[in-house]
Amino acid sequence: MDAAHMGADLEKVLITEEEIHAKLDELAAMIAREYDGKDLLLVGVLKGAVMVMADLMRALPMTAPVDWMAVSSYGSGTKSSGVVRILKDLDTDITGRHVLIVEDIIDSGLTLSWIKANLESRNPASVEICTLLRKPEAAKVDVDVK
């Protein structure tokens, strides 16, 4: 559902579609510069990163393979428990590759820091995080984001 169809339920738009696309273009240019000539793998975190990943891939001036992870860190509520389970692991061996985790928004940072540590244990050349948005007021751990 888009903002036009939310009617009275929508108080205000925090970030416009144009601002989102401009930020994704900026991120794509940074990624292209940093990973030029490197064996890059984009890793999306399901399900939230699907749209951001699709838009980011369209904005990239290069092609890069993509893989997906799905994890769960929410118990019965909506707050992160900090206990993470892998629901869908990568299909790709990341040994020696440059891994860029793509996320839509960082909330507490607990799940993302766990994913990063998990991927770092698999001997990649590097693991970095790319996110469109973050909620600094919700942060429970410091997550280093490019």
Region locations from a protein language model:
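PRPP-associated nucleotide enzymes
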Residues: 1-146
